[in-house]
Amino acid sequence: MSDTPPHSSTSPVPHARRGSGALSHTLAPLAPADLPHLWLLHSDPRTFTLDTIGPLETVDQMQRVLGMWLDSHERDGFGYCAIREAGSGEFLGVAGLSAMPLGKRWVANTYVRLAPRAWGTGVATAALTTCLREVAALDTAPREAAFITALANHPARRLAERLGFTLSSESDPTESGAHVVYLLDLHDHT
């Protein structure tokens, strides 16, 4: 699935792929064992500062979300990846794409959430670039990607633009109405 070579068999992250961000990292599909790290990330209020929603309140919520993410990955052949620092294996965050309806069509929706330690390191750009290329190479994936973020989340909006997404006039698919939708033709990433 990756156009980058996997780590050696001694990698602490099975099926890992090297990233190219300023902070050297690996990507690997999420697994049930990632639950403790995902819970710490998604319960940290700092990682939700610019979102219209707040952090998760219970580990059970994170377990249900992780179950949905794993099911989606199994069903669609693509999904979210754990991002770990190369060498140390420290969990830095999660990034990837998942299929979702947008209007009357299906798109590959972009997701990224990083631990504060990884902010501003280039990891989000590098991880999502890799994920976009991998999804674009799949015959069964949607041909369009979406990046939906809070209107006031300027760092995420800049990230979308760095990745080549274009601000669209698409209606906010969330209940809050406080989001913008960026779109990207995945044919451009093959």
Go through the PLM ranges and name each one.
Residues 68-70, 169-170:
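Short, P/G- and charge-enriched loop/turn segments at secondary-structure junctions
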